[in-house]
Amino acid sequence: MNKDKSKQKPQKKENNNNNNKNNNNNNNKTENNKTNKDFTKNKFDKDAKIDKVDNKKIFHNRSSQKRIAKLKKIELQKKPLTLKLNEIKSIEQRLIDEAPQRGTNPLANISSTTATTTTTTATKNDKEKEKEYKIDYPSATDFKDLPISQLTLKALTESKFLKLTDIQRASLPHTLCGRDILGAAKTGSGKTLSFILPILETLWRNRWGRDDGIGAIVLSPTRELAIQIFDVLKAVGKYHTFSAGLIIGGRNVQQEKDKINAMNILIATPGRLLQHMDETYGFDCSNLKILVLDEADRILDLGFSKCLNSIVENLPRERQTLLFSATQTKSIRDLARLSLQEPEYISVYEKDITTTPQNLTQTLCVIPLEMKLNMLFSFIKTHLTSKIIVFFASCKQVRFAHETFKLLNPGTTLFPLHGKMKQWTRLEVFEDFCKKKAGTLFATDIAARGLDFPAVEWVIQVDCPDDIETYIHRVGRTARNDAPGQSITILLPSEKDGMVNLMEKQKMKFEILEPNPEKLVSIDSKLSSFLSEKTDLKYLAQKSFVSYLRSVYRQSNKEIFKIQELNINEFSKSLGLLGTPNIQFGKASADSKNKSFVVSNIQKQLKDKKSKGEKDIDSSDDDDDDEERNKIGNSDDEDSEDDSDFQDDSDDDNKKVTKQQPKTNIEKLFDRKNANVMSETYQKLRTKEEDEEDDSMFVVKRRDHDLDNLDIVKRLSRKENKEKNFINDPTKLKFQESTSVPKDGKLPTSYIEKVKSEVEKGDVQDKILLKERLKRKKLKLQSKELRKQSGGGATGDDEEESVAYFVPPGEKDPYENGENDSDDESNDDDVWGQEYNSDDDDDDEESESEEQPKPITKKRTLEDHEESALKFLKKNRI
């Protein structure tokens, strides 16, 4: 224990030494604080060393602190603006310095993005190296190498747009510089980003706001393509503050009018945009910077040329115009001359590269017309897990194929898409098909342009395309973005040679396949059974039959489309029809409603030559026209009628048109040869009736039709009719013949006098009875008063007497209505309750008047009442 104490003593000494050291340190700190306090005594000493002193102790004045805080906030607010301005300056300087030369194609720059790194030796501790790209942006292959804003680049990376496609590499260097472009590229090559990026960057560099109005307009041929462009714009420009609007048909115009003036970017169809230019108040495009025409060839094909010209006239001339198309035709070049200023012609097609994707395998399937649907059903049945698009020539064919194949139930989901559908149903079908991993879409050429259907494996063209451009757009729905794809085009034997020649001119690689008809699944019998059960399907089959033949007849390329070689009867049987429908071609105009296209074209040529003063027509042309007209079976009678308008002259080579004298109605009637065709006035009446039938679709109709068949309603209606007939027609009443009237026609005076005498006697008796009743009532009242005075009262037996009073027939009681009633109703019953004896009935009236009423002492039984009633009745009968 002592040892332990000895060990503890030096520890205490050490603790004391430590405490002394701490005290010395604290003293030193207090001395330093004193010196600081002495230093800050001068409050307004600006030369003081602020870094070594606390700011709160120096600037203890609150006003100075607030001023410094405001300055810091202003600097922080200015930082993003200054950064944005610096970024805009650097991008603009780079665009000026590295702009490609006019007439060059940046796609020719083979050099990849190479960069040299330079190290900065400002300090020895800096180990990082800054990279400076010395390559020009026209040679860029990634979006990050382009002179674009960080907001756009961030959205591109999030949307997984990293590499530039060929059309983007070729067009973006020129469009970012503000040049006009006429670009041509194959479908699925990324043309949408080629004009969306310049729109966003141009408005961003100009610091565009809502008050600046409309800065860019994108015109699309179809609504679906406009919606698709709008979706890409939302994805790429989501970090920008621009307002964008979708202006298409099928939507509420008034809502668009209310919001269109607050938009910066408009994506529209030509018709709806022109409508807003004409109708919307305050619609102003004077500040427009960029105009984009996407799928310009399709816009012109749909007949929007006049609409485009009027739109371009309302836009400012100082603008940037971008025109993109899959094909460049003469009409597009004419449009480019009108709307573009010094354009750059950019095409990504090489001499050895066709306009179709490289990963696309093309097949031509030659088969008869009546085996088309069997071929299609067999193919769908064997490709249930693949995504297929099937193209038809008309809307009626799409509807018929979709309805019948649904009944056949091939085992996959089927979708229809055509121009007769409403806008939002088309949009729903488009979105549903895009989400599906497997399915079949029956569509017209409305789905052939610009629409991006993801992961489409097969494209089947049941009907031959109109031209090679339509073929390119159809097969372009597959093999997009370097993905593999396959296409099958079903051709007739008469269409094979012409289509093969067109594809060989474009240097396309394809295979020709002739399937065995015996191995195909036949659906003719099933279709005929469906049509026999459902009249709607039969109507659709007839319409699809007629629409297909009309589409073939109206084609301009007669080398491919030969209507004379079609087996119409077998084709109608393949659709399930028992007979071939009657067809009448040529309803192009009102003047030639019942004439073929050949005759109407001749009349147009005659009118044109009349206006120019040329009346001569070559006879050779007429002979050719006659041969073509004779080939069409249903137009023989019509053509014979039309030939009467032309008269032969002495010259064999030429024919002259001479004016005919007007004919009377009778002459026209006898000269008429085709009795099945109605006159123009009757056709107008038919169109009016059809319009009225269409209008009646929207009329509200009564639904409770079963009420008309109820028996109750019929009975009530009969009663009402009977009453009305009885009231309105009194002449129909028949009276019964009276037998009392003598044959001489004199009135029965003796009978009338007899009746009068009987009535007078009855009146005397009634008066006597009335007097007796009054007397009895008075006597009864007097007897009651006497009893009260004498102290007696009515016994309970008297009050409870059950009496009966019988009024003679035809006699009315004067007290029924309450007249002369007393307060006590029970007393009245006692007065009238009296016995009638047989002796009283034999007495005269005088003896009855002398008799006085006797009080009732006995209680009357039911037998007594019956006897009194019988006596009373016998007396009245006498």
Swiss-Prot record:
Residues spanned by motif DEAD box: 294-297
Motif (Q motif): 141-169
PROSITE patterns from the UniProt entry: DEAD_ATP_HELICASE, HELICASE_ATP_BIND_1, HELICASE_CTER, Q_MOTIF
Basic and acidic residues compositional bias, start-end: 1-15, 31-53, 608-618, 665-674, 860-869
Cellular localization per UniProt: Nucleus, Nucleolus
One MF annotation (Gene Ontology) recorded for this entry: RNA helicase activity
Stated role: Probable ATP-dependent RNA helicase which may be involved in ribosome biogenesis.
Domain notes: The Q motif is unique to and characteristic of the DEAD box family of RNA helicases and controls ATP binding and hydrolysis.
Family designation: Belongs to the DEAD box helicase family. DDX10/DBP4 subfamily.
Name this protein carries in UniProt: Probable ATP-dependent RNA helicase ddx10
Taxon lineage: Eukaryota, Amoebozoa, Evosea, Eumycetozoa, Dictyostelia
